[in-house]
Amino acid sequence: MNTPEDSSLGREVAYPSGYDPSLLFPIPRAAGRAAIGLRGALPFVGRDRWHAYELSWLDAHGKPCVATATLHVPCESPALIESKSLKLYLNSLNATRFNSAEAVRARIATDLSTRAGADVSVEFGLPPIDAVGEGESIDALDIAIDDYGPPKADYLATHAGTVVEEVLASALLKSNCPVTGQPDWASVTLRYRGAPIDREGLLRYLVSFRDHADFHEQCVERIFQDLLVRCAPQWLVVEARYTRRGGLDINPVRTSPQMPTPLSIFRDLRQ
């Protein structure tokens, strides 16, 4: 079984001189899910949306082409794709000739699907930037915080009263790469229907990820699971938009299966 320590993270790696799909490094999702008590049927559906800003190849005549792309990896896939390996893989296309842009798109989709173990969709272009931001920010709450990890679900609570349907947001999520320790920065949005979630407790909970080491996808699944267990919403959506590194950013979204409408697809200004 592949582990994060076996990947190219934190190592000096020669950039590939030619197309090489073996560079893609899948990491099984099962271990991260077992750590938060998920061993059977998943309580969510969703995807990991990647934005690729540095994509290039050669056309049939050897002239360079450039593009951006959006990749959708379903959360039902047995494996996630380690980010540095995806960067190296995309760079392996730089000196490779293709007859058309569609051939490039299809090749990337096929290679990612093979390594993730499920159908990965690829489309050229990026979502628009959300200049306003969805939801009501909780970041201006005037509270003292001195707990930066490990993540503490005990902070999560609800208020008795009328059922609400609302969208809350924070730009203060920070976690760390589990191999290199590099900081990962994100905005997180949660949409739910249920008893009102205590906002001070929610902010303390999100800040408690600050010293936590885990992959982006696993952080979002932990947030979803903790909110589901502690706050028992009728339905829930959690999305994190992580800032760019190595020409890529990752945007995991997890939703209750009965969620009526998905969150709109946007990028953050910080991305």
UniProtKB/Swiss-Prot annotation:
Residue positions binding substrate: I81, E82, S83, H216, E217
GO CC terms, sorted: cytosol
One GO molecular-function entry: preQ1 synthase activity
Pathway per the UniProt entry: tRNA modification; tRNA-queuosine biosynthesis
GO annotation, biological process: queuosine biosynthetic process; tRNA modification
Domain of life where this protein originates: Bacteria
Residue positions of the active site: C177 (thioimide intermediate), D184 (proton donor)
Leading EC class: oxidoreductase
Signal peptide: none
The entry's keywords: Cytoplasm, NADP, Oxidoreductase, Queuosine biosynthesis
Location within or outside the cell: Cytoplasm
SUPFAM superfamilies: Tetrahydrobiopterin biosynthesis enzymes-like
Substrates-to-products reaction catalysed: 7-aminomethyl-7-carbaguanine + 2 NADP(+) = 7-cyano-7-deazaguanine + 2 NADPH + 3 H(+)
Residues given in the record as NADPH binding sites: S83, K84, R245, G246
EC number: 1.7.1.13
Family of this protein: Belongs to the GTP cyclohydrolase I family. QueF type 2 subfamily.
Record text on subunit structure and interactions: Homodimer.
Function, as annotated: Catalyzes the NADPH-dependent reduction of 7-cyano-7-deazaguanine (preQ0) to 7-aminomethyl-7-deazaguanine (preQ1).
Protein name: NADPH-dependent 7-cyano-7-deazaguanine reductase
Organism: Xanthomonas campestris pv. campestris (strain ATCC 33913 / DSM 3586 / NCPPB 528 / LMG 568 / P 25)
Source organism phylogeny: Bacteria, Pseudomonadati, Pseudomonadota, Gammaproteobacteria, Lysobacterales
